[in-house]
């Protein structure tokens, strides 16, 4: 029998911690193998205030999953939520390499490179860089600029930022349990992926996720996240 390869996600909330494990199916989708939820203390409005209490809850949930599946969890993706997660917009531009032949993928990549060089404030880190739209010669807004004729290609990106201290505390809590954090994802963007259709994202929709300590809000329009916020309760 072929050994399964598992993907683990850990969501540490203000009232409980959820550990979910999935495996890849033949059709490429992810099948859920186990989900365990345990009450948690030591977390307030998404921020770890007591690492021992939070760690004990994570340990209990992880141990139950390991017992159920007969595996040892050593790495996982994590979700994070709190008022320390926010979005900010940034606009930049490049001059196209060959205006006579239209925008090519290299021009778009050059614009992405400029956005990747944008630095967060010292106390924050950038989690996501999401293009909102493109402008050709500052006149016409387009969704895919490749093939458009212009000298100047501009774009506005939505940056999702997270405070470094809450992120470091989450990483520390997992490392104390021997779990390496492969990546971290804002919960405000994770929930819409589970509940929204592509048509809903296209037409415009807001998702409000009311949790035990915070409420996550995400607004989608024309297929991309336009705004995210986390409100402490």
Give, region by region, the residue ranges found by the protein language model.
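Nucleotide/phosphate-binding catalytic cleft detector across ATP-hydrolyzing
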Residues: 1-16, 20-207, 224-228
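A cytosolic small-molecule/anion-sensing beta-strand core signal
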Residues: 221
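Short, glycine/acidic-enriched loop or turn micro-motifs at the edges of active sites
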Residues: 14, 211-214
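A structural feature that tracks compact, well-ordered secondary-structure segments
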Residues: 216-218
